[in-house]
Amino acid sequence: MNIPNLDQNVILIDSVSKRYNLCGARVGCIISHNKEVMAAAMKFAQARLCPPVLGQMASIGALDTPDEYFEEVKAEYIKRRDFMIEGLNKMEGVFTPLPMGAFYTIAELPVDDTENFARWMLETFRIDNETTMVTPAASFYKTPGMGKNHARIAYVLEVDEMKKALHILEEGLKAYPGRTI
């Protein structure tokens, strides 16, 4: 926040849902030295009543979380990330870079359209009556056409479950009618 000559261009956004693994808790903050940004943010904030009480109460409790918790969570997510990235990059035609600060990756898949592939996986493909889900990444891009064959894949499952999900994904990619390789 104190970068010389850039203080008017820096916005810090944080949330308890990300910092404390409180998925769905809509409690967070926005900080900036830019008065126009803060005035616009306040207009939105004042138009809303408040986050749900349960999320507020959980957030208060989360503030007392010991540092050791974060070290354990970080180590676990690094393990999950490395497992996921290695597994994806071993699949024919799949590429994903190593994320450095998220719990998901954006993977390039050998498919004609990830929206169609994701729907096909959910509606048609099964192994032992199970499937896996990917999130089409096109909506994360502003440029039209970007991300059409990319998927956002979270590594929030434990490694044993991810292993199964990766196997299902790999077999689904092999069987998908819109495969491009």
Language-model segments: which ranges?
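PLP-dependent class I/II
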Residues: 1-181
